Design a protein with these regions (language model features):
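N-terminal basic/disordered segments at the start of proteins
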Residues: 1-34
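General beta-strand structural signal in soluble alpha/beta enzymes
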Residues: 7-9, 31-32, 72-75, 105, ...
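Conserved mixed alpha/beta catalytic, RNA-binding, or beta-rich assembly cores of soluble enzyme
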Residues: 22, 36, 123-227
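Conserved alpha/beta cores of soluble small-molecule-handling proteins
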Residues: 27-28, 32-34, 52-86, 110, ...
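Feature captures the catalytic cores and cofactor-binding loops of soluble hydro-lyases/lyases
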Residues: 34-67, 86-95, 189-268
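Hydrophobic alpha-helical segments and helix pairs
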Residues: 88-143
Length: 268
């Protein structure tokens, strides 16, 4: 990467964390925030900032080019429903999507990346900015009933890995060795709320990356807000794939989980 970088910011604190890491490296950072998703305050932290919608790829590319930027990274959650709905309202994107084998999240995002590439903006691997945030392996917050959590995890772990590899979702919720909820377009937090409404307290939430995860595309992540959702749902545990799913605001999340009786576990 050169001395200038574009950041495409989706939902969650990942965008803010990555912007901070990039600026520590001395990069000029122009941020394009996804309207209705990117966290507030990025305008004050970026060297240049503009809002955009999922269909505004030409405007996004022009914004970056106007600041001398030819390379960008994409961070934060870009919900499938936004891409599937609003982005396909752009005729050029709709024509591109019509030629795709499916409209799964990774397929659509790769198509949008190719579209930006043709417009002169290369979307790069963001891994260099994520090193401080990897989820460690082991128990971060102990479970009240560790044997029960391990039983649920042993049941659900191969399922969530398969779910991720099938590009359906990256979150699975289980209880009593049964699948309660599978993440679809709604995202992790809404999946957890739905599971709690269906099965009550004590669910175990599992989150994993795809086996062949393209780090540019829909990288799974967890943070304080996700843990707060689990506490509200009175979940038993959150099990995250260690080393492959970034965990932001980890110390604050550990404190919230411990206070709320939710175990946090990193698993490979």
């Amino acid at each position: 990467m050169g001395s200038r970088l574009g950041l495409i910011a989706g939902a969650g604190e990942l965008s803010r964390a990555v912007l901070a890491e990039a600026k520590k490296s001395g990069l000029f950072c122009a941020v394009a925030g996804l309207r209705g998703a990117a966290p507030a305050g990025l305008e004050r932290e970026a060297d240049a900032f503009a809002w955009f919608g999922p269909a505004d790829l030409d405007e996004l590319a022009a914004f970056f080019r106007g600041h001398g930027i030819r390379e960008a990274v994409m961070f934060g959650k870009i919900e499938h429903r936004l891409i599937f709905g609003e982005a396909l309202g752009n005729g050029a994107i709709r024509a591109l999507a019509a030629a795709l084998p499916d409209h799964s999240p990774s397929t659509l995002l790769r198509a949008l990346i190719e579209y930006l590439g043709a417009a002169g903006i290369a979307v790069r691997d963001p891994s260099r900015f994520l090193e401080p945030y990897g989820c460690p392996e082991g128990v971060l917050v102990p479970a009240a009933a560790p044997e029960a959590v391990e039983t649920e995890t042993a049941f659900g772990w191969p399922l969530v890995r398969t779910l991720a590899d099938l590009d359906i979702g990256q979150t699975l919720v289980v209880k009593d060795r049964a699948v309660v909820a599978v993440e679809g377009m709604e995202g992790t937090d809404e999946t957890v709320r739905r599971a709690a409404a269906l099965a009550g307290p004590g669910v175990v939430v599992l989150k994993a990356a795809r086996t062949r995860q393209d780090p540019r595309v829909d990288l799974p992540m967890v943070g304080l807000e996700t843990v707060r959702t689990l506490v509200e749902a009175r979940a038993a545990a959150l099990v995250v794939e260690a080393g492959r799913v970034p965990f932001f605001q980890r110390e604050e999340a550990r404190a919230a989980a411990a206070a709320g009786g939710v175990a946090l576990i990193g698993r490979r």
